[in-house]
Amino acid sequence: MPDTLTVIDNRTGKKYEIPIQYGTYPRYGAAIPTTDFRQIKVSDDDFGLLGYDPAFTNTASCRSSITHIDGERGILRYRGYPIEDLAVNSSFLEVAFLIVHGMLPTRTELDEWSYDITHHAIVHENIKKFMDGFRYDAHPMGILISTVAALSTFYPEAKRIRDVEIRNEQIHRLIAKIPTIAAFAYRHSQGFPYTYPDNGLGYCGNFLSMMYKMTEKYTPDPVLEKALDVVFILHVDHEQNCSANAMRSVGSSLPDPYVSVAAAAAGLYGPLHGGANEQVLHMLQEIGHISRVPAYIKKVKQGDIRLMGFGHRVYKNYDPRAKILKEMTHRVLGVTEKNTLLDVAVELERIALEDDYFVNRQLYPNVDFYSGLIYQAMGFPLEMFPVLFAIPRTVGWLAQWAEMLDDPEQKIARPRQIYTGDDVCQYVPIEDR
């Protein structure tokens, strides 16, 4: 007999058996189909019970085989592969193939995939004209969101999302063009001429070239190129977060992927999602020196200020991505100018992890704690931080979108509500109000 949950409605005395469903890990993935609660009624004309879960803190909106997170034990896996293994042994484009296709590629498959991505990086000249229309001080993330949405008008065939070949073509285009658009957005804000993609460079090296190349050929530093590759791997996907949910929700109405990615990027734009590492840098700059860390910690414990870069909605342990980024930060600063903020960050982490106040509250460093230091060391301005998040996360969004389209259980997203407004009101003419 399958596992069930027995529910007794004290309003009627009736008993109901609700089936329990499991994912790969029963201890982590048990769920109840909330639609089964519709049968629980006081009378036949009763709508039935709804599940009330603001912000979806305990609601599984889909079945997914892309990313597994065990927040209690600090585990993150892409398609079953530990993030630590991929960060050391893989590359961003190989991980992108894994995320999109569900398996690691053969050498031939990886070569073909890399070639296709590389040779789709160029954008239409009219896209450049479109981007020229933004103010000189427009935020790069706003430019990115608008430009990705505009791509929809350049590829009208993209609306045929049930055609797998056409769908895959759009996936290639988006993964390839996002770095180009991101670099163009930066150069627009600086008043620099746009730099075209260089097919002789890798994915991350090409992005760095489009960002920083002037008149001479740009050769990326191998340490910085590898560091960016690892940072991108760590940001590819993270289960059903705000932006992934936006991608699925908008995508469920079956538009082309360009507008869905634009919607997901808009979700990422908010400071609670894609802007957290910028807030970490502001905090470290405010502290300024390791000697001021104890006083700052005291203010945090008094509730006067927040400790940025610590704690996570899912992780109740050390974020595995933060461990990798901590080591990578030291490598990056070994080839760039030394940043005293790293000393502040390390001391802040040390004190916090030894303090029962933070340990008891399960506040550990998250991915944003060190990523901002890496970006800053590589010369990226603060306003580019959410853009740098969007580049690799586009891969995850597209994988989530494709998985949703192939899932027969999925429908157009349409959550319910509990109405708390007035009952029937009588209209009053404006003269009598």
Language model feature labels by segment:
Residues 1-433:
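Non-transmembrane, aqueous-exposed alpha-helical and coiled segments at domain scale
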